[in-house]
Structure formats: structure tokens, C-alpha cells
Amino acid sequence: MAIRIGITGGIGSGKSVVSKILSLLDIPIYLSDDEAKRLTATDETIRRELTDLLGDELYQGGILNKQKLANYLFASADNAEKINAIIHPQVKQDFRRWCTCHSASQFVALESAILFESGFDSEVDVVVMVYAPQE
């Protein structure tokens, strides 16, 4: 099994730069933000649970109403916890499947701005914390 590298850091810290460097070394990169967006739009479990929480109009014509989701998500910390409790487990499951697909690789990497906050640190073997000063 591949060694799983977690890449995290604040906004503008250079996570994407580190990911690109690792990618140049042929290390597969799982971009958790992108995958969470993809799963929120397509995963049946997420769609069902979000619809149960926010109503059928969340997916209009099968398309996610991002504004409605964002309005709810950012209205309170409690709302964010509810949304994260729906999405994060599915992203973790997807990451595990993705790792299985890349099991022949020596290393794989997971880029996540909220690696620790989301509990994804338990999914990786080593963490790279990216930090860049403001100047």
C-alpha cells in the first residue's frame, strides 16, 4: 500500500504548489476540495441527506443550488457541522477507494485545507504543513 501524504496549510500558503511539485514526481494527488464539490453534486447519499436537511429545491433539475447550500452553511457553526457530517464521511470513503486504485504507487497525497479539522489526518501516514509568510 502507498504511503499517504497529507498536505495542509492556510489559504495562499502554497498547498497547490507543493501538490504540483509532488505531481511532477508522478505522485497521484487527491484534491479534497475538488472531490468534495464533485461528490456533493453527484453522490446519491450526499444528495439524499442534503435534500432531507434542506428540502427538494436544493437540487433543481438535478443541479445543486450552490447559493442555497452556501447560505445555510455559513449561517451558523451548527449548520456547518451538519453539512460537514454529511459530506466528510463520503469524501473519506471516496479517498479510500481512490487510494486502492493507486495502490501500485509508492506514495499518494491528499491536499486539504482542513485536514485536521475534518479528521482526515487519520487517513494519512505523514502530514506536510505548508506555511508562507505574508511578505
What is each PLM-predicted segment?
Residues 94-101, 107-135:
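ATP-dependent NMP and nucleoside kinases share a basic, alpha-helical "lid"
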Residues 23-32, 44-45:
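Post-Walker A helix-loop "phosphate-sensing" segment adjacent to the P-loop in P-loop NTPases
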Residues 10, 22:
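P-loop (Walker A) phosphate-binding loop of NTP-binding proteins
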Residues 13:
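ATP-binding Walker
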Residues 16:
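Walker A/P-loop
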